[in-house]
Amino acid sequence: MKRNPTLTERFRILLLPLFLGLLLGFGVLLAQDAALQLTEKVIVSAEKKYGPGARVRLLAWTKMIADNRKKPEAEKLKLANDFFNQIPWVSDIENWGVEDYWATPVEMLASNGGDCEDYAIGKYFTLLALGFPMDRLRINYVLAPAQDPVNQAHMVLTYYPKPDAVPFVLDNLVKEIKPASARPDLVPVYSFNGEGLWMAKERASGRASNSSSKISLWAQLNERMGKEL
């Protein structure tokens, strides 16, 4: 009798190509040009589609980044975490009409809604723009059965003060920034940034998984972000 794949195995089968696609593109762009600026054309377009609140949110985002690049790291972490956590949670079906859509930070802020991956991605790019080294940031797919027993998949951002340190978790569900050691409710599966992809068991060794795969979801996101900046 054929065994049904476990949830973790389904993560590996369905999401691994997506993670690998994230190793390319916009993360490198932001790391090289951290002075984030949005054109008036992008802001006007968002305002026409989503109303005047879109302009307010986008300008608040760029101002927050511009005003705080020289602040201490702990303060910048809290600023980015709090800024995106104030955006309402909205499912991809409700917001975009599809089951899985990775919104750009501009799209999330303009539409005033997003789900777990949008929070993590928005914080990641914001911290890059605030001057954080890419190698200290990881976007993490985790299982969070205590938060949602039915759909356990969740995404958070982690920050490593030092390469071998216990990371801090930036989450939209538990909004206080805590060390990962204080978040036993999260079961790590994968982590990635613009430089590599790590399975949970590989993180301690510092070894990145190797692949050059790309998929359309990230390619489309990268294309949209290129038009926004």
Kindly give the residue locations of the regions a language model identified.
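N-terminal secretory signal peptides that target proteins for export/translocation
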Residues: 1-9
